[in-house]
């Protein structure tokens, strides 16, 4: 509404209320107009203003249409890229060898449920999915298999997985090794996407027929690193030797009812205590297959022997199911010092990055930097330890059971394994799980 019309409306109000309005010279011609005359004049003026208002409205509408069109154009520009169609690409079955430091991960195997830390496999498969080597995170989609599962905190140096991945070559071209240089550089591509504590070390482009990373493995080689301070290494070596051969290891593992395992016999090929330096040793263990937490349980018993809390022959007693049908209650050794050192397979053609390749040098430098990072932290920790007062533990009356983590477990009076309470037998654990599963499915 224009100022002029507002003045006319004000005049109308003055007339209707009978008040004496102060009128300007510009408005004096309307002083004696009646209410009806003023209304007619207002109507005339409003009608005269309409074309002007419609003109501006038309301009405003055009602006809105232009903005709307620009938004549509931008939306098209930001449109999601076309979905990658795996059916239009060749695939091939390969094996990958890799190493990882386990303390930043929630174990090797990818999990269906949420985990507080990422898993090693999950990290690798996410990298593969990102660069379109695999179509999804569903393992069954590409014949996935792993050699040896490792738990949270445990590392591996020569872990192996086998799976089907995208390829640049046809089936016929894949059979000819002269075409390998035209293949996707799997090691380089993945290492560019993976964190520094997971590294692909080699690829086998043509695994043996019917190869499976789990079932084709001949044996697995573990190492458990420990500080030899206050331990009788000779006794530990004797106890370790008793593990060799086929033995029942139900008292050296964590029972898992979901697996419904009834055969706990496993073959140990080699079991030794080896020196690494003046301070550190390793429990060096080679076997065909292992049970859940088996190595950590074996190491826990070796620590008890090394502290002279148990005799070396306790190994023979615990592997004799007639004498010890149920596992005594004891704590496993710490997870961090354990590593899956190697996985032995039939002869395979592993292709490693060439040492003079720029990318290989780049990844080697990153690994050296990571190693230096931990060495510097260790050096700082040693200085930290040296500047702090040291307590005299010689008069400490309680026993500290060595678990490999430097802290151990404090107990008032040590109870021999043969005198401890025992865990439920295998048959009960399996039956409980089966009953629970059946009730859930009803």
From Swiss-Prot:
User: Keywords of this protein's UniProt record, alphabetized?
Assistant: Isomerase, Nucleus, tRNA processing
**Keyword set includes Translocase:** no
| UniProt keyword Nucleus, yes or no | yes
EC number annotated for this UniProt entry? 5.4.99.45
Q: Where is the signal peptide?
A: none
Q: Where in the cell is it found?
A: Nucleus
Q: What is its main location?
A: nucleus
Binding positions for substrate per the UniProt entry: 222
Q: Which SUPFAM superfamilies match?
A: Pseudouridine synthase
Pfam families from the UniProt entry: PseudoU_synth_1
- Which GO biological-process labels does this protein carry? mRNA pseudouridine synthesis; tRNA pseudouridine synthesis
Q: Name one GO cellular component term.
A: nucleus
- Name any one GO molecular function: tRNA pseudouridine(38/39) synthase activity
Bridged cysteine pairs (disulfide): none
Q: Where is the active site?
A: 151 (nucleophile)
Q: Which PANTHER family match?
A: PSEUDOURIDYLATE SYNTHASE, TRNA PSEUDOURIDINE(38_39) SYNTHASE
Function recorded in the entry:
Formation of pseudouridines at positions 38 and 39 in the anticodon stem and loop of transfer RNAs.
Miscellaneous comment as given in the Swiss-Prot or TrEMBL entry: Present with 5860 molecules/cell in log phase SD medium.
Official protein name in the record = tRNA pseudouridine(38/39) synthase
Give the species: Saccharomyces cerevisiae (strain ATCC 204508 / S288c) (Baker's yeast)
What gene name is given for the protein in this entry? Answer: DEG1
């Amino acid at each position: 509404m224009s100022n002029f019309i507002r003045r006319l409306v004000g005049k109308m109000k003055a007339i209707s209320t009978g008040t004496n309005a102060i009128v300007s010279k510009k408005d004096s011609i309307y002083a004696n107009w009646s209410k009806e005359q003023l209304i007619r004049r207002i109507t005339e003026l409003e009608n005269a203003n309409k074309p002007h208002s419609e003109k501006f409205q038309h301009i405003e509408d055009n602006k809105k249409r232009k903005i709307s069109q620009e938004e549509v154009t931008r939306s098209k520009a930001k449109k999601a890229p076309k979905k990658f169609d795996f059916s239009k690409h060749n695939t091939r079955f390969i094996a990958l060898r890799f190493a990882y430091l386990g303390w930043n991960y929630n174990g090797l195997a990818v999990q269906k449920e949420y985990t507080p830390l990422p898993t090693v496999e999950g990290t690798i498969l996410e990298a593969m999915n990102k660069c379109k080597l695999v179509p999804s995170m569903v393992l069954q989609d590409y014949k996935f298999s792993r050699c040896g599962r490792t738990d949270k905190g445990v590392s591996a140096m020569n872990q192996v997985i086998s799976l089907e991945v995208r390829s640049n070559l046809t089936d016929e071209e894949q059979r000819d090794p002269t075409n390998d240089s035209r293949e996707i550089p799997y090691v380089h591509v993945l290492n560019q996407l993976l964190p520094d504590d997971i590294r692909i070390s080699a690829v086998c482009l043509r695994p043996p027929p019917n190869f499976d990373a789990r079932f084709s493995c001949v044996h697995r080689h573990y190492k458990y690193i420990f500080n030899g301070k206050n331990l009788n290494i000779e006794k530990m070596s004797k106890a370790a030797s008793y593990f060799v051969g086929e033995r029942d290891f139900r008292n050296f593992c964590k029972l898992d009812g979901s697996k419904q395992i009834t055969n706990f016999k496993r073959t140990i090929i080699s079991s030794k205590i080896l020196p690494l330096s003046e301070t550190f040793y390793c429990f060096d263990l080679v076997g065909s297959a292992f049970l859940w937490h088996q190595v950590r349980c074996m190491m826990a018993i070796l620590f008890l022997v090394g502290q002279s809390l148990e005799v070396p022959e306790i190994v023979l007693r615990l592997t004799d199911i007639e004498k010890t049908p149920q596992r005594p209650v004891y704590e496993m050794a710490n997870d961090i010092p354990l590593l899956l050192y190697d996985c032995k397979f039939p002869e395979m053609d592993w292709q490693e990055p060439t040492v003079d390749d720029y990318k290989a040098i780049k990844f080697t430098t990153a690994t050296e930097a990571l190693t230096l990072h931990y060495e510097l932290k260790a050096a700082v920790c040693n200085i930290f330890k040296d500047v702090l007062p040291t307590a005299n533990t010689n008069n400490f009356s309680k026993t500290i059971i060595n678990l490999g983590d430097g802290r151990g477990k404090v107990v008032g009076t040590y109870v021999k394994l043969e005198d401890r309470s025992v865990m439920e037998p295998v048959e009960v654990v399996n039956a409980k799980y089966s009953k629970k599963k059946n009730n859930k499915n009803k």
